[in-house]
Design a protein with these regions (language model features):
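Short catalytic/metal-binding and nucleic-acid-binding patches
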Residues: 1-161
């Protein structure tokens, strides 16, 4: 029996350990809303993301990955009910023999350690990534991440509870 081939989502011949910024989205399995709740607020109050215990675990691992890999920064992120958006930057190594991690290494660590710590957390296979190629692109993505909670009901990952 022939298995369907997965669509290749990565850029061929691109070095995902090279210096640069990357926009990444990864989802919970079956898009289960277990990471947070979004309170859209009333009147002029800004929306607030209230992390669940599982979401707090994911947030801890987002911060921990920058300690594990000195060349990695997480510039901005938001933990939505069933997915995470983040900007990961890989910077030049400042010595040492170990190579820079790839983007896949970074996301693998966040997903595997958080699901190990919270066994009820299961992640969807793979992730979406976009190579950020300009300051304008970077700022648009930054604003998208910051504005995402306010647009939760219109989000393509939205599932009504």
């Amino acid at each position: 029996m022939d298995c369907p081939k997965r669509k290749q989502t990565r850029l061929p011949e691109f070095d995902y350990s090279s210096n640069g910024a990357y926009f990444v989205t990864f989802c919970t399995q079956d898009r289960r809303c277990i990471l947070s709740d979004v309170d859209v607020g009333e009147g002029l109050a800004p929306p607030a993301v209230c992390l669940s215990a599982i979401g707090q675990c994911v947030e801890q691992e987002i911060h921990a990955v920058t300690k594990r890999y000195e060349s990695v920064r997480i510039d901005n992120y938001v933990i939505m009910p069933n997915h995470v958006h983040l900007i990961a930057s890989i910077c030049e190594q400042t010595g040492g023999a170990s190579p820079s991690p790839t983007l896949a290494d970074i996301i693998r660590v966040i997903k595997s350690v958080s699901s190990h710590r919270c066994p009820e957390l299961k992640w969807q296979r793979s992730y979406y990534e976009h190579v950020i190629r300009s300051e304008r692109d970077y700022l648009e993505i930054w604003n998208y991440i910051d504005g995402n909670p306010g647009k939760w009901a219109d989000d393509k990952y939205y599932i009504e509870a």
